[in-house]
Amino acid sequence: MNLSATLILAFGMSMDAFAASVGKGATLHKPALREALRTGLIFGVIEAITPLIGWGLGLLSSQYIMRWDHWVAFTLLAFLGGRMVLAGWKQQPLETSLVGKHSLGVLIATAIATSLDALAIGVGLAMLQVNILHAALLIGLATLIMSTIGMLLGRFVGPCLGSKAEIIGGLILIGIGCNILYSHIGEAMLAHLPG
């Protein structure tokens, strides 16, 4: 795999984290650059680690992992997104409804959920001639950049939306989960078509 293909892969893999970061940034009144960088760093590190794990597991057993990763991602994202939607629906003041929503634990759970597709990519990369450390580093760096930008973009969207920002952020997470599930189910259905 050449450098341009790896870069395209890296930025493609960062899109889920970017969308989640926009939603997360929108729920904050004004996320500071420090908070945006923290989010980008957490998303980037986890996004870099998961293809390494997937690559290692792919050398052992790719079929089992690829059978379940999309369900785990969907469940985590739907749960986190559902919590955000319910809190926004109750129309709690934004400051109180978000207590704990941006905690390290929630941030890591969101990052893991959006990076499970990178786990599957890692499994696939195990079948190719690729420098996995180079690919993982580029994926992590692209995700760090895109997540930081996403948080900062969400900053401008949030004040316009008020308490609806949490609902939209939750719907974005649910949408990402549904997209992951849909793409894997669609691929499975296409694989079973005759001809």
Curated annotation (Swiss-Prot):
HAMAP family recorded for this chain?
Answer: MntP_pump
Q: What keywords were assigned to this record?
A: Cell inner membrane, Cell membrane, Ion transport, Manganese, Membrane, Transmembrane, Transmembrane helix, Transport
* InterPro entries in UniProt: Mntp/YtaF, Put_MntP
**What does the protein in this record do?**
Probably functions as a manganese efflux pump.
Q: Which residues cross the membrane?
A: 3-23, 40-60, 68-88, 106-126, 132-152, 165-185
How is the protein disposed in the membrane? Multi-pass membrane protein
Subcellular location per UniProt equals: Cell inner membrane
What Pfam families does the entry give? Mntp (PF02659)
Organism, as annotated = Sodalis glossinidius (strain morsitans)
Q: Name one GO molecular function term.
A: manganese ion transmembrane transporter activity
* Location, primary (coarse class): membrane
Q: What is this protein called?
A: Putative manganese efflux pump MntP
The family annotation for this protein states: Belongs to the MntP (TC 9.B.29) family.
